[in-house]
Structure formats: structure tokens, C-alpha cells
Amino acid sequence: EGKDGFLQSYAPSPDISRAAANLGTVWETMNIAVKPYPSCRYSHSAMGAIAAMRSKNNISIEDVEKVEVGLPHTGWRIIGETDESKRKPTGAVDGQFSMPFCGAVVLREGTMGWDDYDKHLNDNDTLALAAKFTTVTDPWAESEYPDNMAGIVRIKTSRESFEHSVTVPKGEPENFMTDAEARSKFDDLVAPYLSE
């Protein structure tokens, strides 16, 4: 560990002795999040809210008029500021940091996996849906930050409006993925490379 080492990069006052403290008795990996979606973590609460509303309300994509996503300000700056790269990402990395794109994929598919970038980056229907998204700094989400990367989503359709918020995104220790969800993510990631 030097002045530009790993600990110096991530901790204001690193104490290397803490790395081995309670070794073998405290399992810190049980205190870390496992992301269910292949996108920026700031998008996950909103993606979970969209998936929940889609599942519960049988929302038809054709009926969607507009979608508003509320995030903490820091998240909004990273994935929500409205510019062309957020509405029409040109590659997977742009897509990972685009709330409109990730939200549109989840609204269409019910979830999002790694292969959805290839499937949706040039899909006119997905991009048209992403164009209906507006991302804002939300006072409630901001009040939850930095303890939680909360998100709230409002979907207006031609027949009615829906709203759902998620305080703790799926994958956090307090809202960990089920074994089935973790297995599904694993299968999604390895399927292109492993035979049955």
C-alpha cells in the first residue's frame, strides 16, 4: 500500500490492520450488495419499481404516455441528466448509465440482463419508450440518500397512472436477492458460454 494504493484511493484515513481484524470470524462479504441488474446502481430502485408496477398492473407498452423517475441528486447527475446519450445510448457503457434506457428495457421485458444491451440498443420501440422518460431529482429520494439509493417512479398511461417507490434496492444486504434470483442472474450471465 503506497500513497496511490487501493486503500488510499477509497478511504480518507485507511487503517490496514482492519483488513485482517476478526479474520475467519466476521464475513464482510455478507455486508455487500450484489447487483441484480447490469447497470449503474443508482438505477436499481427505479428499475425494481418499474418491474413491480409492470407485474402488478399489466401495463401495456402501447398505453404508456410518460414515465417520471425520481432519484437522489447524485444519481440524477450520473444516470438521469437528459441529453442524447441518455435517450439513445450508442453502446453498453452508455446504456448502463442511462436511466431512460434501462427503465424502458425493464418496462418492456420485466427485468434486464446483460444480453438486453445487444437486443435493445438499436431497437426503435425501446428507444421510443426511453424518449418518454423524464428523470428528476426527487425530494424524498434525496432525503434517503446516502443511506439508501432510493427511487420513485410515476407511470402515466392512457387509462390510468401508477406510482411506486423503492427505498432499499434489491441486492442490498437488507433486501438481498433470493437464491432463485441469484441463480437466474448467474444462468443469464453464463448461458452464452456454457452448454446445457
What is each stretch, according to the model?
Residues E1-E196:
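Terminal-appendage/accessory-domain detector
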